[in-house]
């Protein structure tokens, strides 16, 4: 029994399972895929040997996770590029809160001082005059 050749519809694209580029792979690509699979399976086997060890003590450290955590947290400067956006964000988050709290405390102090000078502020628990 022979199947007719698939022809793509005008209203839909060719399904990925019928894409010849998915199956017609060069020998270099197959070799690279096999090497990656061998590395993955070796690392998986090492992890499973450590995980299912009955005399295991402590935590199993995954070197890839340690590298990722180090790159995300402690090693930001090799990946940091100063530009206008980062400079403005640094000023906004570094100096902005200081300016905000200065404004809040200054206006509150000025308001209280004005009420004290007018004699309208109730200072019942004030220790010094």
Curated annotation (Swiss-Prot):
Residues with PTM N-acetylserine: 2
Transmembrane stretches, start-end: 86-105
Main location: mitochondrion
InterPro entries: NADH_UbQ_OxRdtase_NDUFB4_su
Keywords associated with the record: Acetylation, Electron transport, Membrane, Mitochondrion, Mitochondrion inner membrane, Phosphoprotein, Respiratory chain, Transmembrane, Transmembrane helix, Transport
GO CC terms of this entry: mitochondrial inner membrane; mitochondrion; respiratory chain complex I
Topology versus the membrane: Single-pass membrane protein
Record-stated family: Belongs to the complex I NDUFB4 subunit family.
Function according to Swiss-Prot or TrEMBL: Accessory subunit of the mitochondrial membrane respiratory chain NADH dehydrogenase (Complex I), that is believed not to be involved in catalysis. Complex I functions in the transfer of electrons from NADH to the respiratory chain. The immediate electron acceptor for the enzyme is believed to be ubiquinone.
PANTHER family: NADH DEHYDROGENASE [UBIQUINONE] 1 BETA SUBCOMPLEX SUBUNIT 4 (PTHR15469:SF0), NADH-UBIQUINONE OXIDOREDUCTASE B15 SUBUNIT (PTHR15469)
Subunit structure as annotated in this protein's UniProt entry: Complex I is composed of 45 different subunits.
Name the UniProt record assigns to this protein: NADH dehydrogenase [ubiquinone] 1 beta subcomplex subunit 4
Protein source organism: Bos taurus
